[in-house]
């Protein structure tokens, strides 16, 4: 969603007039559900993405567990909770954010910030499938998610296979993701 806009991410950033999450839930989803013959309730809705889209997948499912029966992030880019590291990483991609913007983004969107404030029954109303390659540069972040989810009592499938942050790895994951999502539609 960055598309050379000078902002990055699937989240609302009011200071940058970037309301991507609102667009996703208030415009894109209703449009898709009105245009195509699909069932538009939680029981038949899942979300999945890879890399930055994997980070968006987790956060959207945490923000709106009432909407998704399953969430399947692959190689999720969640970033560091350390403000200085986050600023450095954003700068490396050419994005300039100040400390207050980064602090606000982390507090309202980072999964490790969110899971303690959501009732466990809501967290477990979503079936979780987290998958990341053991040579992926995001492996540590995904491992920390797995540990935090497990410590919180969130039921999840966590998969680590040989692989990097690339399409070769993700293509190998897609059959399992589709099977997992399909099974999620039959859980009710």
Language-model segments: residues:
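Non-catalytic cap/lid and distal C-terminal segments of serine-dependent acyl enzymes
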Residues: 1-188
């Amino acid at each position: 969603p960055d598309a050379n806009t000078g902002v990055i991410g699937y989240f609302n950033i009011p200071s940058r007039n970037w309301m991507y999450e609102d667009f996703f839930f208030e415009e894109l989803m209703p449009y898709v559900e009105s245009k195509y013959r699909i069932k538009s309730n939680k029981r038949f809705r899942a979300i999945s993405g890879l890399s930055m889209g994997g980070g968006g997948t987790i956060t959207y499912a945490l923000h709106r567990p009432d909407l998704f029966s399953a969430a399947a992030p692959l190689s999720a880019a969640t970033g560091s909770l350390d403000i200085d590291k986050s600023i450095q990483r954003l700068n490396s991609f050419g994005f300039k954010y100040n400390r207050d913007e980064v602090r606000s983004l982390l507090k309202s969107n980072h999964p490790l910030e969110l899971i303690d404030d959501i009732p466990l029954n809501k967290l477990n109303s979503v079936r979780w499938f987290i998958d990341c390659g053991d040579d992926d540069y995001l492996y540590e972040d995904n491992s920390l998610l797995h540990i935090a989810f497990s410590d919180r009592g969130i039921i999840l499938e966590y998969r680590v296979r040989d692989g990097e942050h690339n399409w070769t790895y993700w293509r190998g994951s897609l059959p399992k993701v589709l099977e997992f999502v399909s099974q999620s539609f039959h859980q009710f």
